[in-house]
């Protein structure tokens, strides 16, 4: 069950990184000019 939950969370993170149109994922996608999330 731990492996399934881990795969589920990784899947959600992959979906979040694949949708830059979502305003909540702007910092995750590295579109923010002030914060250096992705170098």
Curated annotation (Swiss-Prot):
InterPro entries, alphabetized: Bomanin
GO cellular component, one term: extracellular region
Keywords associated with the record: Disulfide bond, Immunity, Innate immunity, Secreted, Signal
Leader peptide range in chain numbering: 1-18
Compartment annotation: Secreted
Pro-peptide positions on chain: 19-23
Presence of the UniProt keyword Secreted in the record: yes
Pfam families with a match to the protein in the record: DIM
Induction profile: By bacterial infection (at protein level). Detected within 24 hours of infection.
Tissue-by-tissue expression: Hemolymph (at protein level).
Disulphides: 32-35
BP terms from Gene Ontology: antibacterial humoral response; defense response to Gram-positive bacterium; innate immune response; response to bacterium; response to mycotoxin
Family that this chain belongs to: Belongs to the bomanin family.
Function: Secreted immune-induced peptide induced by Toll signaling. Has a role in resistance bacterial and fungal infections. The strength of antimicrobial activity appears to correlate with the overall level of expression. Has no activity against the fungus C.glabrata in vitro.
Other noteworthy facts: Not induced after bacterial challenge in strains carrying a loss-of-function mutation for Toll. Constitutively expressed in Toll gain-of-function mutants.
Protein name, UniProt field: Bomanin Short 3
Natural source organism: Drosophila melanogaster
Gene that specifies this protein: BomS3
